[in-house]
């Protein structure tokens, strides 16, 4: 079974969000199941030179893009037993950021065509082409509409994964006419047209043999208007080929037993070492070293999607509790400034790190007691999974993958691995925080809850099995 992942980012090469984590971890787990997964991505200038040096030039071809041919170098390398192909074109990929450029429509039109033009030159017979998010959605669309009549492509099946429906790749109509050489028949509501523009993600949904969302709850949510980002009707139409498979975490990276970034390694049977991580975190931020004061942390993009309006509304009420709060992340200036002001107002209780620091993030996961994730929507979420693996109990809103992975503690049965609330309401969140703090001070209950959180399986194993079955069903 030969699978080609077409992605715009991938760990360890380059990362801007959770897509890169998925693209880095899932293929390794599929390989353990006997699936040959290879990955194709742009050769960004942002990729560390050490990784670029590990690749060799495999082939040079031309990619037709509208009226011109564009250079395409195919670089080939291997990391952790996985083969990678990097599409080299400095004009499109020598930039200071992955996305957000005026010509993103052209850049990823080129990349989509380059993926397809490369397939005959990879020395790899592709059974399933698996594209991800808007950046590579048009790979599947172009395969069906322009390449499938060619014997080299006719047997290839397609899977398309929606990691975040909010980002759809919407561009002016000229993209399909000038770059992709698609005629007027593709610019209408049953095809790529979207409120007067062209929508790449829509193309991926229409053309793919199977569509996956990154959690079962998110798969259901995106078929409703509130979450559907104006594609809910289309997703309801194609519901029969839509499924939800929850993401996992890479346990070779996020594992408190082996994590070299944290002060003291530990497992569910050595939680006293977790306390050492808490003291180290308090020392790092200059917080009072109070063992019985819970640390509530957030490691997040500081955006509206992450539920920060709820946090902002009741933050001073949270501060009335005997708690310490650590925020690690960056994003919208209004939230950055708010948390910096709170750190100024509550210097003994609140600390903020604007930006991202991988080593510090691991220490925050290991040293905190509670992890707050009150998202407005959350396709899957990785933060809560990492927190659970480190015995840091999540407080989440019941949406998307948060609903699938965090089960609210039931004091009657003792079951659960976290705390959750249903409505997007600041005082519902506040009540849930109060409830979590109450159980934190009941040490036997808390220790059992932490052990339950840490002993569940958050790896990619079950998800990889589900993807393998999906691929298999397409090939039968």
UniProtKB/Swiss-Prot annotation:
Q: Which UniProt keywords apply?
A: Glycogen biosynthesis, Glycosyltransferase, Transferase
What does the entry give for GO biological process? glycogen biosynthetic process
InterPro entries recorded for this chain? Glyco_trans_1, GS/SS, Starch_synth_cat_dom
Q: Which residues bind ADP-alpha-D-glucose?
A: 15
Q: Which Pfam families match?
A: Glyco_transf_5, Glycos_transf_1
Query: What GO molecular function annotations does the UniProt record carry, in alphabetical order?
Result: alpha-1,4-glucan glucosyltransferase (ADP-glucose donor) activity; alpha-1,4-glucan glucosyltransferase (UDP-glucose donor) activity
What Enzyme Commission number(s) appear in the record?
2.4.1.21
Q: Per its UniProt entry, what is the enzyme's top EC class, as one word?
A: transferase
Q: Write out the catalysed reaction.
A: [(1->4)-alpha-D-glucosyl](n) + ADP-alpha-D-glucose = [(1->4)-alpha-D-glucosyl](n+1) + ADP + H(+)
Q: Which HAMAP family match?
A: Glycogen_synth
NCBIfam families found in the cross-reference section? glgA, PRK00654.1-1, PRK00654.1-2
Function statement: Synthesizes alpha-1,4-glucan chains using ADP-glucose.
Q: Which family does it belong to?
A: Belongs to the glycosyltransferase 1 family. Bacterial/plant glycogen synthase subfamily.
Name this polypeptide is given = Glycogen synthase
> Source species, please?
Bacillus cereus (strain ATCC 14579 / DSM 31 / CCUG 7414 / JCM 2152 / NBRC 15305 / NCIMB 9373 / NCTC 2599 / NRRL B-3711)
